[in-house]
Amino acid sequence: MTEPGASPEDPWVKASPVGAHAGEGRAGRARARRGAGRRGASLLSPKSPTLSVPRGCREDSSHPACAKVEYAYSDNSLDPGLFVESTRKGSVVSRANSIGSTSASSVPNTDDEDSDYHQEAYKESYKDRRRRAHTQAEQKRRDAIKRGYDDLQTIVPTCQQQDFSIGSQKLSKAIVLQKTIDYIQFLHKEKKKQEEEVSTLRKDVTALKIMKVNYEQIVKAHQDNPHEGEDQVSDQVKFNVFQGIMDSLFQSFNASISVASFQELSACVFSWIEEHCKPQTLREIVIGVLHQLKNQLY
């Protein structure tokens, strides 16, 4: 049975086995359905059955069996409904595959991938920060060294003097350090020399202070007794005092000295000075000589 509104000239009606046998009545349509079912089963089966061609078909194509064979192998044997349905299913499957692939490709990154990306970015930024900090510290260190060498050239006088062997070239760091070392050694020697001079001057100051005190006492004693010392002492009396002191010292000197060798003489002289030339011993000798002269004069 044809659909309402379909004309006999419709290609789908001509191509369909049911439409081709539309004029044969109910029996023809049933045969057409059975033939279409068998052909559909043969198409869906994994291996189509082999059709046997009668021997008479080779010579006479008008045989009914030959007509069936030709119909089975003709293009009109395909059911348009099956073709449309298979085409629709294939398009649906291909569309589903394309949607699945698109959805799979458009799946967003997971949390693990995002965390890995952020960790890598943090590591890169941390390395960059460390590299920049290291570069800045190295630049500061070099600037400090350069300023130190410039200060040395300014402070050390020998670095400021022009060396004819070098000419107008800039002094190298090795030359600056060597000149600085030489200048520091020179300053140490000068400091030691000045310390020795200061020590000598301090001793002189101490001796002058002692002499000042003694002179002040003499002046004070003369002011207290203005008439004392008016009578002058003769040169003979002075010589007698000196002679008495020397005679006493010579006696002890002659008893202590040995002239066997120069070394023994030197040793004896030093030992005699340390023993008989002490201030207390000399004072006793002078007082004894003055008492003797006083008794002789008065």
UniProtKB/Swiss-Prot annotation:
UniProt keyword terms in alphabetical order? Activator, Cytoplasm, DNA-binding, Nucleus, Phosphoprotein, Repressor, Transcription, Transcription regulation
- One GO process term, biological-process aspect: regulation of DNA-templated transcription
Residues that the record marks as modified (Phosphoserine) are: 7, 45, 48, 74, 77, 98
Annotated spans, Leucine-zipper: 140-160
Enumerate the CDD domains for this protein. bHLHzip_Mlx
Compositionally biased tracts (Polar residues): 94-109
Please describe what this protein does.
Transcription regulator. Forms a sequence-specific DNA-binding protein complex with MAD1, MAD4, MNT, WBSCR14 and MLXIP which recognizes the core sequence 5'-CACGTG-3'. The TCFL4-MAD1, TCFL4-MAD4, TCFL4-WBSCR14 complexes are transcriptional repressors. Plays a role in transcriptional activation of glycolytic target genes. Involved in glucose-responsive gene regulation.
Q: What is this protein called?
A: Max-like protein X
Tell me what organism the protein belongs to. Homo sapiens (Human)
